[in-house]
Amino acid sequence: MEGANKKHISESFRLAAVLALVGGFLDAYTYICRGQVFSNAQTGNIVLVGLALAENDFINAIYHFLPVIAFIVGVIITETIKRRVKFKETFIHWRQIVIGAEIIILFAIAFIPMGRYDGLVNISISLICAMQVEAFRKVNGTALSTTMCTGNLRTGTEQVYRAIIEKSKDKVRIAAQAYGIVIFFS
């Protein structure tokens, strides 16, 4: 039972902060530099698909829908890695493979010039962001995201309310983590 209380580095605030920093940078990068596409949370892209369809702009609808498809594929890839890679057999944790894939893909993207291949970059980044959000779901036992802010903002606010009502220092800690991840994302 000794391992039951052991904290995983994959749930540490430090790692979550770094991943949130990367997540926020990638969202800003793809939106500002790569054709106004959101790479992390797909809500914005789904809204842009709807707007494009309302204007009968099918090319733009497809352009914004492809990252959504890549995100779905990223979740499936991550779940496949999680299911097939067993630490006892490989001596590598499945989350390390996800981080490794993220690093390799980002390294390759760094050499793709802006402009003509922005769609490929956006699809690739949406894929790795899905892998990240699927692999790193918790911070010190609390469900938080390193690639989007809405849920973290809700969790932080709820925990502040509960901290005041219940006079709980633990709720303050959770709220601080949630707001901290939002700050690192921005």
Which residue ranges define each predicted feature?
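Alpha-helical transmembrane segments of multi-pass membrane proteins
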Residues: 2-186
